[in-house]
């Protein structure tokens, strides 16, 4: 039997406010346990929550960026459940009327054969809520500690429709969402610190069946790799269970990175289990149209719009445009290079950023803003490749590494001169070298003339070797073909 995978994601993005959503306490990460917990966070008697305007504004920003409806009136609700790190016995969230309704995110997904396809993921909602505290199970022998520093931190919970059909699509969506919230500046996106974490609702059904299968929710996935591994394992587990004649039970499960397996944590609750009701301590949230328009006017150019512009203005592929706009800083670096190098170098600039520059950044674990080679320096190197001063191969192998290491202050011209890397410009000298190569490789000449194209590549290699890589490959090709008839 053929199976179809159905996936929906719920993502918690910690909003980048300086204070908590219902109190003035700091949200800074890493403070000593319980030093950033106000009377509101501790649920002491007689205290009342006060809504943080900055959290609302960030939710509006997100809603506008995904083309959603901003609810003119939304309501906060109490989500009731008991857990040691939730002092009130309920979480303040939104249920019936969320602040952000609908919206879409378009993603680029890599298929099984390496091709890319585009897909639009529909969002159900995004709502404001407070985070819970943290249970520390490993810090005390035989006991659990509670740290309430995180309690009350503002979250935007972003919920999709069950639109994704593979782990690859889920990861592509999560990456696109992560890129967007960081781009907007509403979340720092630090997955290690829990600022961006995903829950994946996964089910399977026979191909062609309209009804959804029974879903299991994988909680608190804080890396894209874990998200992919967890979904892939869960899908295979569910298929095996069904094919063995067992029914899937709705449940909340955890992913164990050490074993690569999911395991059931508890029976999955439905909304009625949380006994939602409007929070009597908070007035309905009223958002004036003028406020929405002020936020809209202040939005930066969004990734989707910039991607479309890169395709039309620079002639890039949709994949290249998506990669270059992964972060605002990366996109700005690219545009700075093109501004100096000229539009004719738009595609080479993209190739260099996605190739050699990204490789160095990943190798050293640094961001593009910290790259030792600045846009103007890379633009000069591209200009030297374009005007034939150095070959692309020499630039990659010799010039760029020296620039990255700071030799000659990263100046391409100085490095080329100091290392004697300039391509041969004397066509007479190159012609003599090619004559010598042809004379010394009579067998390859004969094979080429008998129709073996590989022999030509061997001759090119010999010519480049004889010039110690200083010849222009295009010129070598041209002269060889001319002499070989």
Curated annotation (Swiss-Prot):
E.C. number(s) listed in UniProt: 6.3.5.-
Pfam family, one: GatB_N
GO BP: glutaminyl-tRNAGln biosynthesis via transamidation; translation
The UniProt record lists the keyword Phosphoprotein: no
Superkingdom field: Bacteria
Protein keywords: ATP-binding, Ligase, Nucleotide-binding, Protein biosynthesis
Catalytic reaction list: L-glutamyl-tRNA(Gln) + L-glutamine + ATP + H2O = L-glutaminyl-tRNA(Gln) + L-glutamate + ADP + phosphate + H(+); L-aspartyl-tRNA(Asn) + L-glutamine + ATP + H2O = L-asparaginyl-tRNA(Asn) + L-glutamate + ADP + phosphate + 2 H(+)
GO MF annotations, alphabetized: asparaginyl-tRNA synthase (glutamine-hydrolyzing) activity; ATP binding; glutaminyl-tRNA synthase (glutamine-hydrolyzing) activity
Enzyme category, top tier: ligase
Transmembrane segment boundaries: none
Family of this protein: Belongs to the GatB/GatE family. GatB subfamily.
NCBIfam families cross-referenced by the UniProt entry: gatB, PRK05477.1-2, PRK05477.1-4, PRK05477.1-5
UniProt subunit comment: Heterotrimer of A, B and C subunits.
Annotated function: Allows the formation of correctly charged Asn-tRNA(Asn) or Gln-tRNA(Gln) through the transamidation of misacylated Asp-tRNA(Asn) or Glu-tRNA(Gln) in organisms which lack either or both of asparaginyl-tRNA or glutaminyl-tRNA synthetases. The reaction takes place in the presence of glutamine and ATP through an activated phospho-Asp-tRNA(Asn) or phospho-Glu-tRNA(Gln).
Protein name according to UniProt: Aspartyl/glutamyl-tRNA(Asn/Gln) amidotransferase subunit B
Species assigned in the record: Cupriavidus taiwanensis (strain DSM 17343 / BCRC 17206 / CCUG 44338 / CIP 107171 / LMG 19424 / R1)
Lineage of the organism: Bacteria, Pseudomonadati, Pseudomonadota, Betaproteobacteria, Burkholderiales
């Amino acid at each position: 039997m053929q199976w179809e995978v159905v996936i929906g994601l719920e993502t918690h993005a910690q909003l980048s406010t300086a204070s908590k959503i219902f109190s003035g306490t700091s949200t800074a990460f890493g403070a000593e346990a319980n030093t950033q917990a106000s009377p509101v966070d501790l649920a002491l008697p007689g205290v009342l929550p006060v809504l943080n305007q900055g959290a609302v504004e960030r939710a509006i920003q997100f809603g506008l960026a995904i083309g959603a409806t901003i609810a003119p009136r939304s309501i906060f609700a109490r989500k009731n459940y008991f857990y040691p790190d939730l002092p009130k016995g309920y979480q303040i969230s939104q249920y019936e009327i969320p602040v952000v309704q609908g919206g879409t995110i378009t993603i680029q997904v890599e298929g099984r054969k390496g091709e890319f396809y585009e897909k639009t993921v529909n969002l159900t909602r995004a709502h404001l809520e407070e985070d819970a505290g943290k249970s520390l199970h490993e810090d005390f022998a035989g006991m659990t500690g509670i740290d309430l520093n995180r309690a009350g931190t503002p979250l935007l919970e972003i919920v999709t429709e069950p639109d994704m059909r593979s782990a690859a699509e889920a990861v592509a969506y999560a990456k696109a969402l992560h890129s967007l919230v960081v781009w907007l500046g509403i979340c720092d996106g630090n997955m290690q610190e829990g600022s961006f974490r995903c829950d994946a609702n996964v089910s399977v059904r026979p191909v062609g069946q309209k009804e959804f299968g029974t879903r299991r929710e994988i909680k608190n996935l804080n890396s894209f790799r874990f998200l992919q591994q967890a979904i892939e394992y869960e899908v295979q587990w569910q298929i095996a269970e069904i094919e063995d004649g067992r029914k899937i039970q709705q449940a909340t499960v955890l992913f164990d990175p050490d074993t690569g397996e999911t395991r059931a944590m508890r029976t999955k609750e439905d909304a009625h289990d949380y006994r939602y009701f409007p929070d009597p301590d908070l007035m309905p949230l009223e958002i004036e149209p003028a406020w929405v328009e002020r936020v809209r006017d202040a939005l930066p150019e969004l990734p989707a719009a910039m991607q479309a512009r890169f395709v039309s203005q620079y002639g890039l592929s949709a994949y290249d445009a998506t990669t270059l706009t992964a972060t605002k800083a990366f996109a700005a670096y690219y545009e700075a290079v093109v501004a100096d190098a000229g539009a004719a170098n738009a595609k080479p600039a993209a190739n260099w950023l996605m190739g050699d520059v990204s490789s160095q950044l990943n190798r050293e674990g640094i961001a593009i803003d910290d790259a030792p080679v600045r846009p103007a320096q890379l633009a000069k190197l591209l200009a030297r490749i374009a005007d034939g001063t150095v070959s692309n191969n020499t630039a990659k192998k010799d010039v760029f590494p020296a620039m990255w290491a700071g030799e000659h202050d990263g100046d391409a011209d100085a490095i080329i001169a100091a290392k004697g890397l300039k391509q041969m410009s004397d066509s007479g000298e190159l012609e003599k070298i090619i004559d010598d190569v042809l004379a010394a490789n009579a067998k390859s000449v004969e094979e080429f003339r008998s129709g073996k194209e590989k022999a030509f590549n061997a001759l090119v290699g010999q010519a480049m070797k004889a010039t110690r890589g200083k010849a222009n490959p295009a010129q070598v090709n041209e002269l060889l073909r001319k002499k070989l008839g």
